[in-house]
């Protein structure tokens, strides 16, 4: 079984202080709809939507248009990783240890079917995978505004989502690691738990929408909403 966990747990205040970005419309649909629809595929058997409690009812209103019975909306946690933890706990009695859990940022509405399928293919081989693209710019370690080190670019990747894991690996990792607040993505939790995480090549177009400018940069001419 392939399970998609889509995270909308944050408030998106860098996008707008008054209007959560998942409800902003472009091309006739909300960001939430654009992202969720990328996972309405026959090879996705269950979808868990994780949302901030403030926006639970509004999210349910948007999602009720999808008649599939295998879409569940649950509450997120105080940080991204606690939102993932809530999903991991919710899934405990719904899926088996060998099922695949595909975790995706709700703010990445341009993920392609090909990237999702590559995640599924690789997780069946390796158990834990992360979508990533090679960095194109030189990266420096900086401390007190002084460059300390410039690592070779060939070793550096920008991590994206989906990040996909066998449920047994995800469950054991989130049980083992207690200081979740220091982690910013799921692959780092699994890595800290001692598992190897393999790379799935992503796409530059799979950007995370953080500010209004991100939408304008990819050619969205009109954004609807009280922003």
From Swiss-Prot:
Recorded catalytic activity of this chain's protein: 2-C-methyl-D-erythritol 4-phosphate + CTP + H(+) = 4-CDP-2-C-methyl-D-erythritol + diphosphate
GO BP term, example: isopentenyl diphosphate biosynthetic process, methylerythritol 4-phosphate pathway
PROSITE patterns: ISPD (PS01295)
Keyword Transferase: yes
E.C. designation(s): 2.7.7.60
Site, Transition state stabilizer: residue positions: 14, 21
CDD domains (alphabetical): CDP-ME_synthetase (cd02516)
UniProt similarity note: Belongs to the IspD/TarI cytidylyltransferase family. IspD subfamily.
Annotated function: Catalyzes the formation of 4-diphosphocytidyl-2-C-methyl-D-erythritol from CTP and 2-C-methyl-D-erythritol 4-phosphate (MEP).
NCBIfam families assigned to the protein according to its UniProt record, in alphabetical order: ispD, PRK00155.1-3
Identification of the protein by name: 2-C-methyl-D-erythritol 4-phosphate cytidylyltransferase
Gene: ispD
């Amino acid at each position: 079984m392939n399970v998609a966990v889509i995270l909308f747990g944050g408030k998106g205040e860098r996008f707008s202080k008054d209007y959560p970005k998942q409800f902003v419309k472009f091309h006739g649909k909300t960001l939430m709809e654009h992202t969720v629809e990328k996972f309405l595929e026959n090879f996705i058997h269950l979808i868990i939507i994780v949302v901030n409690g403030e926006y639970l009812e509004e999210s349910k209103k948007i999602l009720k248009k999808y008649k599939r019975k295998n879409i569940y909306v649950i509450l997120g946690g105080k940080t991204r990783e606690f939102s993932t933890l809530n999903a991991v706990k919710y899934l405990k009695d719904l899926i088996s240890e060998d099922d695949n859990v595909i975790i995706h940022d709700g703010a990445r509405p341009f993920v392609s079917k090909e990237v999702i399928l590559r995640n599924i293919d690789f997780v069946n081989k390796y158990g834990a995978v992360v979508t990533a693209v090679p960095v194109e710019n030189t990266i420096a370690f900086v401390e007190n505004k002084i460059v300390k080190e410039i690592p070779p670019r060939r070793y550096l990747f920008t991590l994206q989502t989906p990040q996909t894991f066998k449920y047994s690996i995800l469950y054991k990792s989130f049980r083992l690691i207690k200081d979740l607040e220091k982690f910013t993505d799921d692959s780092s939790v699994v890595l800290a738990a001692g598992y190897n995480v393999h790379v799935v090549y992503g796409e530059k177009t799979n950007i995370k929408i953080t500010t209004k400018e991100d939408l304008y940069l990819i050619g969205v001419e009109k954004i609807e909403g009280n922003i």
